[in-house]
Amino acid sequence: MKRVGSVVAWSVVWAAACAVLSAQNWPSFRGPGASGVADGAPTPVKWNAATGENVLWKTPVPGVAVSSPIVWGDRVFVSTAVSSDPAAGIRTGLYGDVEPAKDVSKHAWKLVALDRRTGKVLWERVAHEGIPKTKRHPKSSQASATPVTDGRRVIVSFGSEGLYAYDVDGKPLWTRDLGVLNAGWFYDPDYEWGIGSSPIIWKNLVIVQCDIQKGSFLAAFDVASGAPVWRTAREEIPSWSTPAIYEGDGHAELITQATTFTRGYDPGTGKELWRLSGNSEITIPTPVIGPGLIIVTNGYFRVQPIFAIKPGATGDITLKGDQTQNQSIAWSTPRGGPYIPTPIIYGDQLYVLGINGVLAAYNVRSGERVYQARVGNGGSFSASPVAADGKIYVASEDGDIFVFKAGPAYELLATNAMGQVVMATPAISNGVIIVRGLKDVFAIGMKP
């Protein structure tokens, strides 16, 4: 590492903080604290993208992007990559191909700001133009990382094309070259899939997780100036997970998951605190911070684990033999973890959605499975669930958004067709659901 510059009580504080913050802003991938929760205002059950029922606005955003929208105040921010090839697109569904997309044309990488109330484009900025330095997965894009904001600055990562900072009015502030980030099939570096991990902000730091074929690292930059603060080397193969921050009991932990280890770090210094092995070969979901627990999941070959980790661990906390818990792990299961969607904790349940639409709900404290159900009729899911107003929203790649009631049994309330592919995780702000489709950004809310 290189230096450059009681559960109940916590549950109440955590739930209250998430509710208050998420009612105002959705500043990063999966919103405040990466929770995916935005209570505090009523949200719609049904809408109709074709007729406009409960659709407040719809704004086209050119390009191919699977990054998610973020919201701060009266602005929505989205990133995109506009290819000069009119045939550029993504391939949805379930398949096992490892070949990257053949789109190697000139691109323009952009950050776009929309008015949250009207959908009007307030500004757009071209961060970079050129031929991509690495290829991308057919299901992904050259703009896969979700921006992050602290309300003054918006930070967006375009991977090998750089890390960029703007103020909320679109003024360029700084940029950082992260190097060529070749993330792809670990068995053959020629199969490039692109990066997917989004930057996060903690206090005065922007933190990025860059797990690549060679030279993986975790790095922090000053959010105001872009100056490097610390950089920690990682012995990891490519992963696509966004890090998360646990804060409680007077300390903070930066949680990263990857194939070799899930790790906890001191976010202020980059020093490793603990590590846990036992993950699948590909790791994508973001760690989820719950009531006195850190939930880590992944769901590729050969295992699909769910770990409920107690904060404050030190050293190697890997389970031994047939163990399912130890001093640092409250509970675990070797099966049931999701491949792409990040789970969500809502109330006292952990909801885990598989890429094939199989949904399982667990008691978050005990790990007991409450129910299992199938969402939809066999479609594929890349977007992560989000929740508000006692409801959970799940978007399929085909563009159907399923709304079901949170609770001890699966109860589907509505299915809403967006009319286009949806890969990005929705944002929720003040009762309005911001849905990023492959062509348009929608604001869904209850009309007077």
Predicted region positions:
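N-terminal hydrophobic targeting signals that begin at the initiator methionine
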Residues: M1-K2
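Noncatalytic, solvent-exposed loop/strand surfaces
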Residues: S22-P448
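Bacterial N-terminal signal peptides
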Residues: V7-V20
